């Protein structure tokens, strides 16, 4: 082992060998079995030269307090204490031949330290071309290379992170110092051995070295005064050569130089070479250059014909290189330039092989181009070329005096950690405009403040930074995460406000266009979102005759889902739901979109789907759930009432099971069922909390503590709370309407002369003339006892407010919330009358008139609204025989009127449904 150590020491300079020997002595003192890079780093940090210490201070971005290095020493000391120790073994020489005392065995060099020494030697040879031909032992590793190799060791980097230092930043500081040393030495006008220590950034060691001696710069480029300029010129020449090589390829031959500072300079040099004919023997022979003026670029969408003609006149027998300039014009007006991208692709296809594009862009611009025009890179055959920012050394290390003075260059104190450099640090996710009411806007601002507080660390420790636990230097990632969270918050509160307070700002949010399945596939002029994270998922479908808040619908959603959206499934669901609940077409569209999105993984990661039906249309919500269950699972939904009126599952209550138990049992029996939890706003607090936990965890726990996975069930929560300010639509007494249509009633067709017709206009269903709250008659009977269960109006108002807050919270947890508009019963009656008249007009002569009695129309429309059967199905079933009877009794020449009326004698129906199964025909 001693022989190997001597061999290794021969490859080190005296200073580096001294550090290694001191490290071995430290390992021996601590009774360690191996000498590791941690020992070397600790020795370097405590050495008298202080080279590593000064580099650490210079590399720290916030402060240069000496106690920071003291904290680093403590961290290395703790790390050394954690290393395993070995029992001291002594080796004694032969007592007969030698009288030397026993000595402690020196620790071996660890594999990590051996690898670091080999790295240092390899870097030393690579950095000095004059040493590459020398024997291996002749290459002397200097202290700087030893430090850099030690900093590359993972154990050393980990300890430095614990002390809030960055190994890459320290390495960068050392390397920049080496470059500064070389340039300062090359500028000295005298003996090369006389060097002013003040001209060096830090850690200068008086080691004689030739002027051209440097570890990272080619000695031929280190001529006095021109070293760095020559290096930059050669680097730029290499980049230009790379661009030319791309332009002469057959594929991906249109370069886009991506950089933040100097790509346009490189483009200018390349285009000048092409114009001067410097590529006369290559693929760019006889190529001409067309530079688009800034005004022409800004109007590219409207002046494509002019550009096409210009290319055609200049292309001749060679080709044309079209300079597109800075591509920021593509992202400034993305909607207007969508057609320009397509036309430029056609131009490339027309002159394939003879037309090249070249342009520049910043990192932010190029990323936005990829977001706005996903296919542009393939359509334009683009090849992105990253261009590193180049600055002259005097700009990085400002000189304090002229060349004749002793003051040269000093290292900048702001040395940025390599880990903190991100290619997307200047890219910001565009924020969408908030279009919610003042209440939701205040909630949004509170959430944003919480996010900023968490990310900026307002609750940071009072300890100085050098005594805090190290954190990864991920400022760029934090910024991107913050932007993503803000976009999600914007989407959340815009969406919530749209559903909960629809009329607050509906005029600002209603989209003018209608949803069309053809437009989903063919429309290309929709403005793309500013970011794939910032897409607003607002549900609904605009309807020509409705002013629902869901009119701000689906185009943003379809743009986000893209190819993953199954149009066939959406169309199937929409057709089935809209057929069953045709008066809630917006809600049907929202339900179909939500189910399709969640089925394709764009919702939550769990298999269960949670929807919330809000609004006053109880019958519409029930029919929507039934239609959805029939389309998805082919069966009827399992309905569990959580409110006081348990109408549909009274039989289950007898068995002593709570609603939570019935919910868990339904999931256990069929993990693919559709389960309706009615009146969630009337449930008790325990059940509400269990539902919220089930939404978050994907598992439901019954009253016995047994957990059941929700599997792939679809859970629909219904709430009757009035959300937001509803439209001024006449309210319907659902209970009274149901009791009326549930009584026995029959219809008859009366065929009579037009002069005998009569009209009745009852208005039992509405109270349009009394829009204000009716005054209650107060009548006190002092002989009656007071009712203890009566509640005041104040209590009722608080209960309604609590229910509204509950719904507001649940909307943020479920996958989607669908608002059911108040039922416009006039439109239901109008469509019912239209369908009835159309059915009669198709079967009878044109001269006959069909009239419908108001009472009959109201009962038919109410029964259609409440029953499971559709209007078309009932007409086909009940009207067939009646039409045949009317045809046989009425002549087309007679001036007759066919009236649909209620029977005077109301008897119980045999069918048991809301609608009569047959219609009697009477000729008056």
Swiss-Prot record:
InterPro entries reported in the protein's UniProt record: ATPase_AAA_core, Clp_N_dom_sf, Clp_R_dom, P-loop_NTPase, SL_signaling_regulator
Tell me the PROSITE patterns matching this sequence.
Answer: CLP_R
Q: Where is this region: Disordered?
A: 86-107, 522-552
GO molecular function, a single term: ATP binding
Stretches for region Repeat 1 = 12-83
- Induction remark: Up-regulated by karrikins and strigolactone treatments.
Effects seen without this gene: No visible phenotype under continuous red light. Smax1 and smxl2 double mutants have substantial reduction in hypocotyl elongation.
Query: In which family does this protein belong, per the annotation?
Result: Belongs to the ClpA/ClpB family.
The UniProt subunit note reads as follows: Interacts probably with TPL/TPR in an EAR-motif dependent manner.
Protein name (database record):
Protein SMAX1-LIKE 2
Name the species this protein comes from.
Arabidopsis thaliana (Mouse-ear cress)
